[in-house]
């Protein structure tokens, strides 16, 4: 089973994935971008830009990472439990200047039509995001600010709605303000 965690920065995806690592010791845990050697280099380029990258080039770099990630991680482990911190869904949401149909077609190509069976979407409000962003050193994407993140979160919700029409998937939406223990319990039940 292929499971992905989605949500903007600072909603607790990494915390919940860490808790699952204690339970699912044989699962494959991965992330996008950066789940492969190529992905680590691309992630560094994308998150710590030293010069401007146009939106089309940025999209294609993310797609290159996704295609490599599919080949090295997803394809070779498709009969195991795979839990990913982000996926093509975030890619579609962050590429908000492009149409969903185009983004879906490009991602379908990069993933050879291999999509998650379950999506866990952690949703946060402005206060939660502000509080958590203030506690960390920000990368180039995080420096775009709260309004940017809330617009991406809105786009994530629209992408999830779009995907319900395109692929067979179960989606669990959770309020990131809940305690990590309560969220963990809800996630465990969803994965059974």
Curated annotation (Swiss-Prot):
Coiled coil: none
Entry's EC annotation: 2.7.4.9
Protein name: Thymidylate kinase
One of the record's GO molecular function terms: ATP binding
One BP annotation, GO: dTTP biosynthetic process
Protein keywords: ATP-binding, Kinase, Nucleotide biosynthesis, Nucleotide-binding, Transferase
Family per record: Belongs to the thymidylate kinase family.
Species of origin: Campylobacter jejuni subsp. jejuni serotype O:2 (strain ATCC 700819 / NCTC 11168)
Superkingdom to which the source organism belongs: Bacteria
